[in-house]
Amino acid sequence: MSFIRLHKDAAAMWLSRLLPAAIFILVGLFSIMVIRDYGRESAAARQTLLEKGNVLIRALESGTRVGMGMRMHHAQQQTLLEEMAGQPGVLWFAVTDAQGVIITHSNPGMVGKSLYSPSEMHQLNPGPQECWRRVDVAANGETVPALEIYRQFQPLFGMRGHGMRGHGMARSANDDEPAKQTIFIAFDASELAATQAREWRNTLIVLSALAAVLLATLLAFFWYQRYQRSHRELLDAMKRKEKLVAMGHLAAGVAHEIRNPLSSIKGLAKYFAERTPAGGESHELAQVMAKEADRLNRVVSELLELVKPAHLTLQAVNLNDIITHSLNLVSQDAQSREIQLRFTANETLKRIQADPDRLTQVLLNLYLNAIHAIGRQGTITVEAKESGTDRVIITVTDSGKGIAPDQLEAIFTPYFTTKADGTGLGLAVVQNIIEQHGGAIKVKSIEGKGAVFTIWLPVIARQQD
């Protein structure tokens, strides 16, 4: 059963990582496709207008060429242009000279007027190939978007050598060359503009939907990770409590069965120590027996301290005062080992709800462990600061020998110790007290470079069950 549960947990973990990655990839690919396809419909509509304009321009050139062969004049060319301007979507036709003066126009009243200034004609620089641009023109009393197509007007192209000299065509200063003319045709681009607006709107909607999917995936992923973390922490807490319950039954039996004999052993050891000469072997053995009885009694007391619920006396406390007081308690021991204690009070630190005696017990345990890890000549640094609006952080950093990576995970486990004379219950008690305050404690260390213990405490503590 445990194997099946482990297999399901592993599958859920991999799915929680692969599914967001797959969604990110699909959203990215779909976004690329949407962006790449943006403008295709409007480009196709614009190309249709360009091809239609090219056909009409060539038709006008052909008609003009035929009319010239039949000795037709500007009047016939004007009539032909007016008839072609009646095509659907055509706003106007115009043929101008190099200075922008209208020679023929679909609106006869425009003939002889200036369509564009010479400087504008120079900027347009019409050539033999069709060019286009977007303009706004007045039509039926309102301004409409238009697609203007223009190029050199070439009705004589291919006629030389056939005896045609360009009848009815304006001549340049050099009588051998006709004056350069430009043909303009303007199409109603309202549908093209609507198509572009629709494309932009649809693309924006699709990209917004993709962004929403991406954001929802990110939120779901982070919420799932948060749920998994909370779930793991809850399972760890349940395991610890189950272990503490089992240890509580054991501790109760141990305390009952061991303490009474220990008291007798200690009493007898003191009795023999008093009855033997000081400095003798028997006297020293009796003292060793008494000390070992005290140590075993202390182990039983710490075990009971660990397994029984901590009854906190919560009150508003100033962390600066707690830290300063606890450092003073170990200052003599640190000074004898040439260990510097560093702490700068944080005057902006808010008061928190905590049990001052229990908190002092926690800090003393961390200081003593740090002093033991340093040995001689080192530094212990304590810092306190706020974390957001509802938590404070206390860090205890030492310059000791550090903790091996394989020991970090077990450092808060009861009876795990790296000291020859340690019981392995100190940090377990520390963790229990911090968790009773509704906080947490973590440790980071690089072997040979010291350790950092970090405590998170809520500003308003509620004793945990």
From Swiss-Prot:
Activity of the ZraS/ZraR two-component system is repressed by the zinc-bound form of ZraP, which probably interacts with the periplasmic region of ZraS. It is found in: Cell inner membrane. It is an enzyme of class 2 (transferase). Its main location: membrane. One of its GO terms (molecular function) is phosphorelay sensor kinase activity. Gene3D superfamilies: 1.10.287.130, Histidine kinase-like ATPase, C-terminal domain, PAS domain. Residues 1-14, 225-465 are cytoplasmic. It is a multi-pass membrane protein. The keyword DNA damage does not apply. It catalyses: ATP + protein L-histidine = ADP + protein N-phospho-L-histidine. Residues 36-203 are periplasmic. One of its GO terms (cellular component) is plasma membrane. It comes from the Bacteria. Its EC number is 2.7.13.3. Autophosphorylated. Residues 253-461 form the Histidine kinase domain. Part of the Zra signaling pathway, an envelope stress response (ESR) system composed of the periplasmic accessory protein ZraP, the histidine kinase ZraS and the transcriptional regulator ZraR. The ZraPSR system contributes to antibiotic resistance and is important for membrane integrity in the presence of membrane-targeting biocides. ZraS is a member of the two-component regulatory system ZraS/ZraR. Functions as a membrane-associated sensor kinase that phosphorylates ZraR in response to high concentrations of Zn(2+) or Pb(2+) in the medium. This is Sensor histidine kinase ZraS.
